[in-house]
Amino acid sequence: RTTGVCVLPEDDGHRMAKEFCRCDALVIGTPVYWGNMSGQMKLMFDRVVPAMMDEPKNGFPIPLHKGKRAVMVTACTTIWPFSWICRETTGTLHAMKEILGYSGFKIVGKMVLSGTRKRKGVPQKMIGKGRRLANKLLHV
């Protein structure tokens, strides 16, 4: 990590790290598995650590994305309110918030869709919320 670039051969991890560095704002989403983010999302975050924060010798992380805004999105098959009571979605949001926070992103909102197994599409209410959050990302 001394160079700020992963030493593994060039792959999607390197490409994602570059995208994080180039972005002005971020919309990040994951399905909920066992009360947390998907394994693919966790692996991606593990691979892009050098692009998200610097780790000086004193051990205190230095966020590399201060001033950038982010929206978090989750979906799970567990119906509300059990998705909240059983900490399905809250565990996922907490994990993403912690990673993005240490990286310097300001969370401007979240979208949570529970009970997806029985849904035939995205409810209009969620589409409206998505538009409002997009405006929050675009307008400081």
Q: Residues of each region from the PLM?
A:
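Local cysteine-cluster metal-coordination motifs and their immediate loop/turn environment
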Residues: 1-8
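Helix-loop-strand module that forms the ligand-binding subsite of alpha/beta enzymes
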Residues: 8-97
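Glycine-rich, flexible loop/turn motifs
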Residues: 2, 60-61, 107
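Glycine-rich phosphate/pyrophosphate-binding loop and the adjoining helix
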Residues: 9, 82, 86-140
